[in-house]
Amino acid sequence: MKEILNRLINHDILTKEDAKQVLVKIAKGEYNTSQIAAFLTVYMMRSITIEELEGFRNALLELCLAIDLSEYNPIDLCGTGGDGKDTFNISTLASFVTAGAGVKVTKHGNYGVSSPCGSSNVMEFLGIKFSNESAFLKKSIDQAGICVLHAPLFHPAMKNVAPIRKELAVKTFFNMLGPMVNPAFPKNQIVGVFNLELARMYGYLYQNTDKNFTVLHALDGYDEISLTGATKTISNNTEGILHPKDFGVKGIEQSQIAGGETIEESARIFIEILKGKGTEAQNNVVCANAGIAIATVNGVSPKEGFESAKESLLSGKGLKALNKLQALSA
C-alpha cells in the first residue's frame, strides 16, 4: 500500500488491474484502517478515472456473492447518494411503485453514509428481512414483485471498509460503485449519479455491457429526477434532457422533497406516500423516477411510464408490494 499511496500522492493513476488488486487486498484484510482511509481520501481530492472505476467494479463483482434472478428480467433503481440534498427515499419508493406496475425489481441498497437515512435504514425500520438466501429472494420477487438486496450481505469482502466509511461520513468512491455492483447482475438499470462527470463514466462503462440502462443526473445536483429543474439522461443509444413538462407536470421547489431528519420520520414519509397521502410534489417525483424505470424496461415514453407509475401508486399497488414483502419477512 505504501507504494500505491506514494504513486497516488505524486498524481499517478492506477491501471485497471492495479485498482482491482488494491480492492482485493483490502478485502483480504492486508491493509490497516489508516492505510484504507488514506487511500479513500485520495479520491476525495481528485477525480477517479474510468480505468480505476472499472478495476474497482470488477473486484467487487468478482468477490460478491452472486444471486441469479435473471428469469425475472428485473431492474434496479439505485442512486449513488452523496449529492448532499437529503431528500426522502425517492429511489426506494420508486422501486415499490415500479414493482406495483408489474416490472420486477431487485433493489440494491445500504445504510446511509453521507445521509441520515439510506435505503436499508428505512427497509429495516419497516420490518423488511435482509437475506442472501436464493429461495427467500425468489419468493419475494415472485409474490411482491421486488426483493431487497442489502449490500453487506452480498459484499462480505467490504466488511473492512464499512466502519471507515461510517467514521469518515462523506462520500467516497464506494458511493460511485454501489449501483454498479448489484449481485443479481440485473440486465436493466436506472442509476442516479451526483455529477455529470460520473454520468459520463457510467454511460461509457455500461455501453460496453449488455445492460439496458438509463443514467440520470439532475442539473441542479440531485442523483435522481428531482423535478426541480432539468435532468440529464444517458441511455443505450441516446442522450437527452428531461424537463418536468415531459411528464406532464410542473416544476417543484427543493423544500418540497426534503427528507426526514430521523429514521422514524423518514419511514413515516415513506408510508404516507405509498398510502397515496403524499403531496402532489412528492407523488410526482416518485412517479417520474418509477416512470423512467418502467419506460426503460418496457420501451415506452417517459410520459407513458409516468402514467403507469401514477396508476400503481394511487391504486395502492406499490403499498401492496411493500405489505407483501413485510408479510414474507415476518
Protein language model features and the residues they cover:
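A generic alpha-helix surface/boundary motif
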Residues: 17, 92, 117, 121, ...
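Acidic, glycine/proline-rich low-complexity segments that act as flexible tails and inter-domain linkers
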Residues: 1-87, 101, 105, 252-257, ...
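Short amphipathic alpha-helical face segments that pack within enzyme cores
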Residues: 38, 93-97, 285, 289-292
